């Protein structure tokens, strides 16, 4: 499947099509035709080669026993909930999480949202948006430590798409330089607090800097100086400017004005 969405890091806020790209009917049709011409066996080989090139980079051994490994997973889960030790199940969950991220967050696509990319409803919980107050960050905490930096690329693009609208938020709400965002986000550059919700939980000015730290983490693991020079540094510098302006001098120290991160408060 495809959509007409395109990432735009310099959006024109007067243009209703500033986030419109390809015709999804054309691209989807071409993909379906190409897939049908290859046949199932070839597609399975391509799929296996694609995900194993990432999945096979990391192994985890917690010395699980074979008897537990031979049990059906639902039974293992029930036993685990009852207090049984099953290190092998923990290994399985570790790799299951990596597989889900590999399958839901690849270059050129949108990042994993509150439901990954899967849910069983047309309108999923919380509209399956991006909650910037910990949820979207949690999706990506394991990515670089488990050697999946490529899977972070859609998240980086999501953050980059917040910078220009986030500059407006910084000026309008906080009289600050740089950029920031708030608790809820979407791929269309939505960075302001929700105007129909209470500011007691909705105003999260340090969300932008929190998101920006992921760009530094990506560089810290990859040591990709081209990324830092061409992408990461400008985003980080702008975020740092907002953070500096958000501080208040109190005697000999600087403090942050009150903020809220609802999911971890």
Segments the model singles out, each with a brief description of its role:
Residues 86, 198-201, 265:
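Active-site rim elements
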Residues 236:
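Conserved functional hotspot residues or short segments at active or partner-binding sites
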Residues 74, 136-137:
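Residue-level signal for cytosolic alpha-helical hairpin/rod architecture
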Residues 253-264:
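Single conserved hydrophobic/aromatic residue that forms the stacking wall/gate
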Residues 105-135, 141-213, 219, 226-231, ...:
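Helix-terminus loop motifs that line ligand-binding clefts
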Residues 1-130, 149-153, 159-170:
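Acidic/polar, glycine-enriched structural segments that form the non-catalytic walls/loops
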